[in-house]
Amino acid sequence: MKKIILSTLVVFSLASCKKESQKNEEGVATTDSTTILNKTEAAKVELKEISQQNLVENLSKKNDTLYVTNFFATWCGPCMMEIPHFKKKIEELKGKPVKFTFVDILDKAAWKDKVPAFARENNLENHIVLVDESKFDDTFFGNFKTWKGNGIPFTHFRKGDKTEEVEGSMSEEMLNEKINSLLK
């Protein structure tokens, strides 16, 4: 009997620890202000959805600017591991002819809240675009030497006629090496 009572108390205690909302003195449920703030802040960030054609045009530009295009998703651990390296490079190369673009292609449902919140949190609002991956076809993947859309992160580098591609997460050293080799 003691085990049953003890088990019930433990379950009740654990269940009460999960506080999503609380009731005020009048018995009206209220929501945690940080939850409201995060949703409000995410709503303020308006990310741009672009077409496959626009993305291909951006990937194909051949001029003196270095274009670094990273395909990612907010739920992807390896993608998130390399974001600090990209942020550091963006800051370091500010004012130089380098354009960083992050393409969120997966989980369209996250485009309303998770991706904008991520963009705001990482100060990447001006670097993230949204592309519906379901519209990618063989023609789209023909723009890459190796990538067929089978994994992320994937980073495409282009300056003039030179291109580099990296499938998988990059270390800071590898990112620096790729960028420096194309900026020469």
Question: What residue spans do the PLM features occupy?
Answer:
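Thiol/disulfide oxidoreductase modules built on the thioredoxin-like
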Residues: 133-180
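Structural microenvironment flanking redox-active thiols in thiol-disulfide oxidoreductases
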Residues: 83-122, 136-141
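Conserved redox-active cysteine motifs that mediate thiol-disulfide chemistry
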Residues: 71-87
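N-terminal targeting signals for export/organelle localization
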Residues: 1-49, 184
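A short beta-strand-turn-helix
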Residues: 46-66
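Hydrophobic beta-strand anchors of alpha/beta hydrolase catalytic cores
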Residues: 68-69, 100, 155
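Short pre-active-site segment immediately N-terminal to redox-active cysteine/selenocysteine motifs
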Residues: 65-67, 72-75, 107, 151
